[in-house]
Amino acid sequence: MLNKNKIVLAAGLSLLTSLSALPVWADTSQKALLSGHEYLAVTNYPDNLQIIDTKTETVYKTCKMPGQFGPGTVSISPDKKRAYVLGNGFREVYGFDLDTCKLEFNAVFSQAYNEDARAMFSFAISVDGKELYSVNNPVHKSSDHYTIKQPRLQVFSTADGLKAKPIRSFPAPRQVYIMQAADDGSLYMAGPDIYKVNVQDGSYTVAIPSRNWKRENYGQPDVLYFWPHQQVNRDFSILYTAPKFTDASQDMDTAEFKYGFFNVNLATGETQTKDFGDVVEIYFTGQRSPADPNLMYGVLNRLTKYDIEKEELLQAQELDHTYYNVLFNTEGDKLYLVGTLSDISIHSAQSLEKIGSIKLPGGDMAITTAQVFIR
């Protein structure tokens, strides 16, 4: 019996020693952000909104989020005082005060007890910060089946607190996934095509044809893009791949496969559809440099840099693992790779070499979208 007690005691001491070796994260929720400082906002499992100080390349503060995690898409308010997060399994948007982590806003997309409505990454904040837009996909839940309903654009007032209800609602096209608000008050949203929407009456026009483009000697483009980055240069960019044929016969055996981007400048409304290179690998996200708009950077299994006008791959950097998001600091000389696991990889925009790493407390970032901003 004595030996058994010694074994139990030894096991208990061993467990305590192991637990004491684990990192202890202090409560940083009340740390106010500093004016003029640059930060990176990102989310990760199980319930974290992380604010990174890009000068020290460390976690500045962590806010706790309610509900089920996912997808964790982040959008920063124009005054840089609030972070909005798409959460609870795509069903709600939360608005957090960045200084105190206080939950100040909550919009639930479902509008009835027997309805389930989810937004597939599709929400945005107006340029004056007063309204939040979302296209969500409702279903009616019966006892033995679901009925798919018309997608809808919901408009919320960001001043309506924790029980925000739509102040306007309009039918929307199907398959809308990401969106950004423009300086002229309109809303651009990506679906089968990229649409320009009047948020007062719900009417829309095609700003950039995608599925329905009519480019000579091109096949239909393919688009997979779920990460709405708020960029310093006011670009709303989406990557595509497409076959480019040698002649009107459209022979796939002789076609070149091109990578390109659709772009809307949210300040001017100017649109662009442009190839930037051959398809040699797959990228989940890409951004043009804020320092040199002729340079395109892409990431998934490698980090790459392209000369857009020459349609030439300039550099490629091997990575420790897959990353989904590439984004710049405001100066355009550093790149942050986020998504998938719980580490942020930092790279030189000039050489693409890895120059740092940030380990996040908690679990994986998964398919979150990060944002860089100056307070």
Regions found by a protein language model. Give the residues of each.
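Bacterial N-terminal signal peptides
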Residues: 10-20
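Bacterial N-terminal signal peptides that target proteins for export
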Residues: 1-11
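Predominantly soluble domains enriched in secretory-pathway, periplasmic, or organellar proteins
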Residues: 20-375
